[in-house]
Amino acid sequence: MQKGKGAYDTGSYPNYLAEAGLHDEQVSRRIQEVFETIFFDPEQGFYHDVDEDSGCMEDTGNHDARTEGMSYGMMMCVQMDRQDLFDKLWCFSKRYMLLHEGRNAGYFAWSVQLDGKHNAEGPAPDGEEYFAMALFMADHRWGSRGRFDYLADGREILRHCIHQPELTGGGTMWNPENKLIKFVPDMEISDPSYHLPHFYELFAEEADEADRPFWREAAQASRAYIAQSAHPVTGLSPEYAAYDATPVLLFGKPWPWYSDAYRVMMNIALDTLWFGPRPEHETLAVNIQRYLATQLPEENYRACMLDGTRTEEPAMHPTAITATCAASVIAGRSEHAGMWLRRFAELPLRTGPRRYYDNCLYFFCLLMLGGQYRIW
């Protein structure tokens, strides 16, 4: 990668895992193996065919299908050039999750049962943003003249995200003043792990023309928010936070650094890979690599306060922590960077009922560290 530039400018996607002894052919083989496990392994996979023309990703810990997982699956498929599976996931999402009435029309129910019956009638914005990005990439990779008009579908999602009040009377997914993504449309708080400035840079090229300046501003606002919400010493980010980046505790959890928050490490890595290094991302990455190096091995990980104070609560997704911390090496290198890359290179997929979230993040980190998470 050229100094100061990312893959958007250079077209270069380095294999960071070569440093851990995995060369391009080995990485490609590992990526294919993990993809096959997620989608086709009868014991360890979590993709299911539902109808002849649709399928879903199961959250194996909660036995439901979530917009998070459905959109993750679509991103996996567009990266792996599997239009057949992509279309099955998008068909399920439109058929069973898309909301047609009321304030949330145009959004997607964040949780449904595996047969499509709704568990919720509200959305979670991390699903919508991944849906839109996967659809735009599908348009670029395969075109929009087949079963679905990917470009039109992606634009419609983003139109609802920022124009919902005039379309349905509902809440926006981004605050129109500060350009920060919300945790849910009707709560004026955020989730640092929802902030994907690298997606918003591309939304600014693909969304409705009139909305493109909004997305450019959102990218800059999110980069600032990610830095602001991270602890200045440990690099830990809260799961939920106010617009001033102070932690918000929800769902009876007294600790702020927990499952959602691990994605921040992965997100700054991909922003760096695509759009180049940033001092604030480097600082966060270096700090969190140093902190987490003191918490190993994986079975020792705990839910934490942002200053690093441990609680007695075990981390629910330890594989995801190691995977995303390794990915953060793309954004910044501490003295532990090589150790984290080697640890990830030797890390197996998670098994058991909580494998869905860990292995989704594992796959994305494998793609980006292996130089194969591309801008299509």
List each language-model region with its residue ranges.
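Alpha-helical repeat scaffolds
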Residues: 212-220, 339-345, 376
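Internal amphipathic alpha-helical repeat/solenoid segments
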Residues: 30-72, 77-120
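Short glycine/serine- and small hydrophobic-enriched flexible loop segments
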Residues: 74-81, 130-141, 198-205, 266-273, ...
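Aromatic-rich carbohydrate-recognition surfaces in CAZymes
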Residues: 63-70, 116-142
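Solenoid-repeat scaffolds in large eukaryotic assemblies
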Residues: 73, 85-86, 147, 154, ...
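Alpha-helix boundary/capping segments in eukaryotic regulatory proteins
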Residues: 81-88, 121-127, 141-148
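Solenoid-like repeat scaffolds
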Residues: 343-353
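Extended ligand-binding clefts on enzyme/binding-domain cores
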Residues: 2-34, 40, 63-67, 102-106, ...
